[in-house]
């Protein structure tokens, strides 16, 4: 039986989320699928050989410094407070610049199962050049045992990159994601929903980055240590 309103699940997964697909697995060119001058956002997609689901890239401007944007994305334990559909987000362990994060996604809709996954996130920031970013890949073997009532996400890889604009007063944000939500969601539903979900990711970032705790570099969210 197909799950109802599958785009709600995809939208939730696209919010995480943040490593690029290996070069050998990429297609040649990105194709622009959405552009909004008012939002200063453009969304691209490209095929990934061997996968029915396309890789996505969102590029947009944020009216906040790169470090503030990075602070938001690195607030892993706080995702449930500002990321839609996130029921639980828990740091499992930290080794230097690498963080293991377990997440539970619940669209709270009939006939749609709760999803979960563990990802390995690497901090790839270059503070000296005011460039910040993360890359992640699926790491379910490092997380909790799968519960029968949940659908385990087997592929979730992506990245965030924040580079300075206007002498560091603003940010050019680049978000890349390739994920398969699993279950019985058809590939056409994933493709349809993904293009509509990326703008929501940027809206969440823009809304949250205005909070004082993310803009003040002397105070950082609990749960991580900036490099």
Language model region names:
Residues 26-227:
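Eukaryotic helix-grip
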Residues 1-2, 193:
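A general boundary/transition motif marking the beginning of the first structured unit of a protein
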Residues 2-13:
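Bacterial N-terminal signal peptides that target proteins for export
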Residues 11-21:
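Bacterial N-terminal signal peptides
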């Amino acid at each position: 039986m197909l799950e109802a309103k599958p785009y709600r699940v995809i939208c939730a997964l696209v919010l995480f989320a943040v490593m690029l697909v290996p070069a050998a697995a990429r297609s040649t060119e990105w194709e622009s699928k959405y552009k909004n001058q008012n939002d200063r956002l453009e969304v691209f997609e490209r095929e990934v050989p061997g996968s029915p689901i396309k890789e996505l890239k969102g590029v947009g401007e944020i009216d906040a410094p790169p470090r503030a944007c990075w602070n938001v994305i690195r607030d892993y334990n706080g995702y449930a407070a500002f990321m839609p559909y996130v029921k639980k987000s828990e740091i499992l362990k930290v080794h230097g610049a690498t963080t293991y994060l377990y997440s539970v996604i619940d669209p709270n809709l009939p006939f749609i199962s709760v999803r979960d996954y563990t990802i390995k996130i690497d901090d790839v920031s270059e503070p000296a050049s005011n460039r910040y970013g993360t890359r992640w890949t699926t790491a379910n073997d490092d997380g909790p045992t799968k519960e029968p009532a949940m659908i385990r996400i087997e592929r979730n890889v992506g990245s965030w990159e924040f580079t300075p604009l206007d002498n560091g007063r603003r940010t050019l944000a680049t978000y890349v994601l390739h994920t398969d939500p699993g279950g019985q969601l058809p590939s056409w539903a994933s493709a349809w929903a993904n293009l509509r979900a990326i703008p929501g990711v940027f809206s969440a970032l823009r809304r949250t980055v205005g909070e004082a705790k993310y803009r003040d570099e002397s105070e950082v969210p609990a749960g991580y240590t900036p490099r």
